[in-house]
Design a protein with these regions (language model features):
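Boundary regions of SH3-family modules and the immediately adjacent low-complexity/disordered segments
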Residues: 72, 148-149, 158-191, 198-201, ...
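Membrane-embedded alpha-helical segments of integral membrane proteins
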Residues: 110-151
């Protein structure tokens, strides 16, 4: 028991030290960026990201640095990652929109009923992490309210337990829906141009071409190839090395 406690304490202190070092590196990148040394800031922030540290602020700053040196695809990639973590941040949304102006391809999604646009807004208002926490939180709160209603039968209103239970179900449905959607992730085209094939083979017919910075959905993968789908429903295959997952 004592050895386990010592191990956990050491793990905690090493974790705290690593967090402090990461924060110090991040601030070093901020200082370099403010001084106009974008390449140094990018190098430092990239090293932090490659250590496995991911936050909305880090991804946003990486997007800004790539945008400054005209790395369109990487800028969009990191802005998209930042948006997944900070879905309501206006600066992230604005800069992502600005970066998208450089995209050559214009893919129009089919017209849908306006109610589905509202559903998308509600779904994307929270990050997946936030939805998970809300689902768990309302689940625990629902159990507590139901137990309290049973133990204090006749002395408390059943309105609160009912409302909490409904919210738990709603967030549960949205969380599961979002998880299913995220199981087929999006990616960004990272090369100047890629010819989309009709099959996962270099000799297959070219069906259309895509350019740097376009967002695509990954439907499946096969031996170094990605089966992709565009917002307008077109599908095809591209080499996996020519896109990077968000």
């Amino acid at each position: 028991m004592r050895r386990t406690t010592i191990f956990l304490l050491l793990l905690f202190f090493f974790s705290m030290a690593a967090t402090g070092a990461t924060k110090s590196l991040f601030e070093k990148g901020v200082d370099a960026y403010r001084q106009g040394n974008v390449d140094e800031a990018l190098r430092v922030w990239q090293s932090v990201y490659e250590r496995g540290y991911e936050s909305g602020a880090l991804c946003y700053n990486l997007g800004n640095a790539h945008f400054r040196i005209e790395h369109t695809a990487q800028a969009i990639l990191f802005y998209e990652r930042a948006k997944n973590l900070l879905p309501r941040d206006k600066d992230v949304t604005a800069n992502l929109g600005l970066a998208r102006l450089s995209i050559v391809d214009r893919v129009e999604a089919p017209v849908r009923l306006i109610i589905w646009n509202w559903v998308d807004v509600v779904r994307d208002f929270f990050s997946l992490r936030e939805l998970r926490l809300l689902f768990i939180g309302f689940g625990v709160l629902s159990c507590a309210c139901i137990i309290a209603a049973i133990l204090l039968s006749g002395r408390v209103s059943r309105t609160l337990p009912t409302v909490v239970l409904v919210l738990w179900i709603v967030f549960g449905v949205v969380f599961v829906w979002r998880s299913i959607l995220d199981s087929q992730p999006y990616a960004i085209i990272t090369v100047d141009k890629v010819d989309v094939k009709s099959a996962p083979d270099e000799t297959a017919k070219d069906v259309f071409a895509l350019h740097e910075g376009l967002k695509i959905r990954i439907k499946s993968g096969l031996a170094g190839w990605l089966n992709i789908e565009l917002a307008d429903g077109r599908r095809g295959w591209i080499p996996a090395a020519q896109a990077e997952q968000i």
